[in-house]
């Protein structure tokens, strides 16, 4: 018989830099999860993606064991890295803060494809393009 899930915790943590300090400690501690073991496991799985924010979905079972699934980095983080900017525009319709090429857009869309509700790369590109527009990033050919 399958173990019963008691909690589903969603966190967005820097790759390879999870520590027992907040937000990890309090989120996992209240469910009785071994925080140090989770941090060690998460850091080991994300060392190759240093510098990115990696969302994680943690399923906690009634015997206090857990499993976790790593998601793809947020499109906004990938777009900011591609455009070499720190943050998006405060007025995206008026002020452009950077630009990316169509090939960079396609690369980001292919990275995000597993987490999006589409299977076509063209649809994924439109989704990521909308995020870019809302950040004040223009797409050039």
Curated annotation (Swiss-Prot):
HAMAP family: Ribosomal_uL11 (MF_00736). InterPro entries: Ribosomal_uL11, Ribosomal_uL11_bac-typ, Ribosomal_uL11_C, Ribosomal_uL11_C_sf, Ribosomal_uL11_CS, Ribosomal_uL11_N, Ribosomal_uL11_N_sf. Coiled coil: none annotated. Forms part of the ribosomal stalk which helps the ribosome interact with GTP-bound translation factors. SUPFAM superfamilies: Ribosomal L11/L12e N-terminal domain, Ribosomal protein L11, C-terminal domain. Belongs to the universal ribosomal protein uL11 family. Part of the ribosomal stalk of the 50S ribosomal subunit. Interacts with L10 and the large rRNA to form the base of the stalk. L10 forms an elongated spine to which L12 dimers bind in a sequential fashion forming a multimeric L10(L12)X complex. Keywords: Chloroplast, Plastid, Ribonucleoprotein, Ribosomal protein, RNA-binding, rRNA-binding. GO terms for molecular function: large ribosomal subunit rRNA binding; structural constituent of ribosome. This is Large ribosomal subunit protein uL11c. GO terms for biological process: translation. It is found in: Plastid, Chloroplast. GO terms for cellular component: chloroplast; mitochondrial large ribosomal subunit.
